[in-house]
Structures are given as structure tokens and as C-alpha cells.
């Protein structure tokens, strides 16, 4: 008998009304690119991001986005749940942009449990999906796991426009450089602290 233990799970489903969101949000996002700056602690020099800026745009559209996201997120949880959303931002990739490997553990005290990526504008023939890294990569080198050694060190999900990914915030991931294209790759990302799961409640 062989038993695989301690899985790492990511979730994926479609966002309702993505086409309407795309029609309403893509152009305002593209119009803001000249105002965006790359955060100082990011390695990439070829990405447009609203991280740490453009908060008014996000705040003005957060309720609309969450109304569409909640139905999708409901599919991910197997019991009653509550979430406190801590960050919202968008990234735009146009000309070979990339995102270095990173996680979403920004706070030492109130770190998020789950992170999300919504592929608002995405062409799977033109754009690169995120790549997730095995969190036990270094430890696996200390042992022989036979079948597990053929699993590779990264997982690349198959994503389409309108998909929403949910994954543990500690899970490191990156986006490899894409090719030059006239089609913008636009994602909306956000983090969440779980405040209720089943009968357990966290006061936040």
C-alpha cells in the first residue's frame, strides 16, 4: 500500500460576469499605466502594478469585484466561512514582463491565509500562466521519494480568461517573461484572512 500525505491544494473556477468586468475595467486600467511605479522591493523592472498605489480605483470597484468573486469562492470552501480581505491590486503585462518568485506573506502578525488571482484579460496562446514552486523542494533532496521525485519542482496550472485561482499565501510562485503582444495580460490579485471556518471563528 502506498499513501500520499500532506497535500498542497490550489483551487480554480470561473468568475461570473467576467466579460462585463472586462468591458468596464480594462480600459481604465490601461489608462492608468503611466502613473504606476514598480515597488522598490520588487526585482522585476518590466511590469505595471497598482500594488501600493492607485487605491482609489480599487476601492471604487472592490464591491463590484467581490460581488462577482463571492459565488466563485463559495465553490472552494467545504463549510461555512468568512474572509477579511487585506489587499487588492492589479498587474498588467505587455512586453516581455515578468514577476520574480515571491509569496504573499507581507505581515509578520496578520498574514493572509489565502491569496487569489483573477485573470481578467488573458489569452492562453499569448500569455504565460503563473508557476508554483514546491514548498518542500529543499527537504525532498534529503530523502528518496521514488514516484514523488518525478513530480518536478513546479506546478503550472492551465488557466483561461475569467478564471479565479485560490492558493495558500505561503506558496511561492512567479510569472516567466512573456512575448511581446498587443493583448494585455491583466490580473487582479487579492489576499484574505480566514475569520470563520465551520464552528471556529477568529476575531479580527
What are the roles of these predicted feature ranges?
Residues 114-118, 182-198:
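A short hydrophobic beta-strand segment most commonly corresponding to one strand
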Residues 94-166, 198-203:
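Catalytic core of non-heme Fe(II) oxygenases with the double-stranded beta-helix
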Residues 100-104, 173-180:
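Short beta-strand His + acidic residue motifs that chelate non-heme Fe in jelly-roll/DSBH
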Residues 155-158, 177-181:
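Exposed beta-sheet edge/beta-hairpin loop segments within beta-rich domains
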Residues 1-81, 98, 129:
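Non-heme Fe(II)/2-oxoglutarate
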Residues 84-92:
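A short glycine-rich, His/Asp/Glu-containing loop-to-beta-strand
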